[in-house]
């Protein structure tokens, strides 16, 4: 199939006086171009990923670049065979990335870490007295990361400042490098690090996505794939020596396939092979496998007898019905 669609990833810190009004107008504009995706708008700027046919994404980029609010905006562009979203959403938010720093909030246009090009980043990672901090969530790290990067034990970005404070001794008197998918989280996080007293802080300009597209570094020193927040879920980065670092949630075998737990009240994202999805009814715990609203059971129209037969193989049982 020909790759007639484009996926645009972008952000821009600026001042949007009326995020609600802007979001409403921007949604209408995106729909007029038949785009699909997710765009967040806040008083501090805009952050989005959209997909559409090339002529439509070209028109979108042209309009955004012509808007004085977004002068100098940079788009990361991927080619795809189809849309990577089902709908188009533009939503106002208090923050573009949720750190909840309140009075300690950082304006990346005033305070942020030094931007390193992909080539500079590769060289910096190999230097002594340097630590590399992954600014993403644990499940993003697990499917792919820079070699030797520290994995903060966090489920959400807002937990990162507390984690840094609790582990501060690891980073004192060292150069800190930090990275994320497209760069937006690190713009604010690196500024926060400097505000906390860390003096030598740098970030990967354009994030992992830009690093993977650089014609010179070609994603070298990246292990696994990069998690993305659309229907693709992961994209390749290392075009020199690709590896698999993700591990199946159930048996630990190499895996890069993400699914959501079939218990809608859990919805945990796990790495899981097709074989284990069927074996474990896409449930991440025994409780999720017997949940009365288990989506796997519903999708495959399993009768109670068929459901129990699957559980028998695991030594588990459906709860007794009253």
From Swiss-Prot:
**Keyword tRNA processing: yes or no?**
yes
Q: Which residues form the active site?
A: 180
Q: Which PROSITE patterns match?
A: RHODANESE_3
One of the entry's Gene Ontology molecular-function terms is: oxidoreductase activity, acting on paired donors, with incorporation or reduction of molecular oxygen
Q: What is its EC number?
A: 1.14.-.-
A Pfam family of this chain: UPF0176_N
Keyword tags: Oxidoreductase, tRNA processing
So what does this thing catalyse?
uridine(34) in tRNA + AH2 + O2 = 5-hydroxyuridine(34) in tRNA + A + H2O
* Gene Ontology BP annotations: tRNA modification
Q: Where is the Rhodanese domain?
A: 126-220
Q: Which family does the record claim for this protein?
A: Belongs to the TrhO family.
Protein name in the entry: tRNA uridine(34) hydroxylase
What is the primary gene name for this protein?
Answer: trhO
């Amino acid at each position: 199939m020909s790759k007639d669609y484009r996926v645009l990833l972008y952000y821009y810190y600026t001042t949007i006086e009326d995020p609600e009004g802007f979001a409403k107008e921007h949604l209408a504009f995106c729909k007029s171009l038949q785009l699909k995706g997710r765009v967040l708008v806040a008083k501090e700027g805009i952050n989005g990923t959209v997909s559409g046919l090339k002529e439509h994404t070209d028109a979108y980029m042209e309009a955004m670049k012509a808007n004085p609010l977004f002068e100098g905006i940079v788009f990361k562009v991927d080619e795809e065979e189809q849309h990577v979203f089902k709908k188009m959403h533009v939503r106002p938010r208090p923050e573009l990335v949720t750190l909840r720093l309140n009075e300690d909030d950082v304006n990346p246009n005033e305070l942020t870490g030094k931007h390193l090009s992909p080539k500079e980043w590769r060289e910096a990672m190999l230097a002594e007295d340097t630590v590399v901090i992954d600014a993403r969530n644990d499940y993003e790290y697990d499917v792919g990361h820079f070699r030797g990067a520290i994995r903060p034990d966090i489920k959400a970005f807002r937990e990162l400042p507390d984690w840094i404070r609790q582990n501060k001794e690891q980073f004192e008197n060292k150069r800190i490098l930090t990275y994320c998918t497209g760069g937006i989280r690190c713009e604010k996080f690196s500024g926060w690090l400097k505000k906390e007293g860390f003096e030598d802080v740098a970030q990967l300009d354009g994030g992992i996505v830009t690093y993977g597209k650089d014609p010179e570094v070609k994603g070298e020193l990246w292990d696994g794939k990069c998690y993305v927040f659309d229907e693709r879920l992961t994209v390749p980065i290392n075009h020199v020596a690709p590896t698999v670092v993700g591990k199946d949630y159930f048996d630990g075998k190499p895996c890069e396939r993400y699914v959501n737990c079939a218990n809608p009240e859990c919805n945990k994202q796990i790495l899981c092979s097709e074989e284990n999805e069927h074996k474990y009814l896409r449930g991440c715990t025994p409780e999720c496998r017997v949940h009365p609203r288990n989506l796997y059971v519903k999708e495959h129209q399993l009768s109670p007898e068929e459901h129990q037969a699957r559980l028998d193989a695991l030594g588990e049982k459906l709860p007794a019905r009253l």
